[in-house]
């Protein structure tokens, strides 16, 4: 509080040797039960039965009807999740904050979030996995167009009956309920927790305080967004049917002489600019064993 010229320069400033960490979204897929499978050569084929035989009733001396199972294939091929983080050598040498460890922890967390995002929202194709929320073979429900006021109105504002409807649609497909779970964001979590009976009693709050909804666990990720009009989305399903093929898990490498191009298209060289650059890589792919194990709901009005 002393004026610098009146002696303030003589009062040393104290810095705590800690840094306030960044607030991250939560990851959800592995917490809900997604499974890692090895992908040694960068690809993996998983045969699957798409249709079964059929048993019929018959009579004496009658021909037995022939039925034939059908088969398909799930193919995983490695896709690269990547990041490069440069730091100046002066920063690494001059700080007491263990800046290298801070950067490493941040990079690891970012890669975990990138994998989670790909599992939910990946667009598919050569360079991205296909996510549960975007896979056209996963059943999709639009909360705005249900034409059933007992479940949701035309704006997508859902009722307390809606989660029961979602659960029932998935279970009707004979889905294994061993790892069924919900994924939605904190805004929708709050909306569901605030649903009340006509007498003012909270319907789901006590159960949701234990981390479950209708008997199944839920996880919150704010990578699932809510737009400015209050619309958001959720997924419900058997997350054990979500396979993460892994050719190589997280690898980090730090160099003093690498080069890279930044987001603005400028070329950088670590040696010339006295930088240290840390690169992180994963080689993975993601697929659902059974597409019918999941249900995605969009256009839910959360506020």
What does each model-found stretch correspond to?
Residues 1-179, 193-205, 211, 218-220, ...:
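Acidic/polar, low-complexity extended loops/arms that serve as protein-protein interfaces
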Residues 72-77, 101-108, 157, 187, ...:
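Sequence/fold signature of self-assembling virion shell proteins
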Residues 181-185:
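Short, conserved beta-strand edge motifs with alternating hydrophobic and charged residues
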């Amino acid at each position: 509080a002393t004026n610098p010229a009146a002696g303030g320069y003589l009062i040393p400033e104290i810095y705590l040797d800690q840094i306030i960490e960044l607030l991250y979204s939560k990851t959800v897929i592995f917490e809900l039960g997604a499974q890692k499978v090895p992908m040694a050569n960068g690809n993996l084929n998983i045969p699957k039965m798409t249709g079964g035989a059929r048993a019929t009733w018959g009579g004496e001396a009658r021909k037995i009807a022939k039925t034939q199972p059908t088969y398909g294939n799930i193919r995983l091929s490695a896709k690269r999740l990547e990041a490069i983080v440069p730091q100046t050598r002066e920063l690494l040498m001059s700080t007491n904050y263990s800046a290298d460890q801070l950067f490493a922890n941040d990079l690891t967390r970012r890669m975990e979030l990138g994998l989670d995002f790909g599992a939910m929202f990946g667009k598919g194709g050569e360079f991205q996995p296909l996510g549960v929320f975007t896979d056209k073979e996963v059943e999709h429900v639009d909360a705005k167009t249900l034409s059933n006021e007992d479940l949701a109105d035309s704006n997508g504002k859902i009722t307390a009956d809606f989660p029961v409807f979602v659960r029932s649609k998935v279970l009707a497909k004979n889905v294994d309920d061993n790892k069924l779970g919900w994924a939605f964001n904190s805004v929708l979590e709050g909306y569901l927790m605030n649903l009340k009976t006509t007498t003012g009693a909270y319907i789901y709050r006590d159960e949701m305080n234990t981390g479950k909804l209708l008997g199944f666990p839920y996880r919150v990720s704010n990578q699932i967004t809510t737009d400015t009009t209050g619309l958001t989305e959720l997924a419900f399903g058997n997350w054990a049917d979500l396979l993460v093929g892994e050719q190589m898990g997280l690898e980090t490498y730090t160099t003093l002489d690498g080069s890279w191009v930044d987001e603005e298209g400028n070329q950088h060289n670590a040696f010339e600019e006295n930088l240290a650059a840390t690169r992180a890589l994963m080689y993975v792919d993601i697929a659902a064993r059974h597409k019918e194990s999941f249900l995605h709901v969009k256009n839910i009005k959360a506020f």
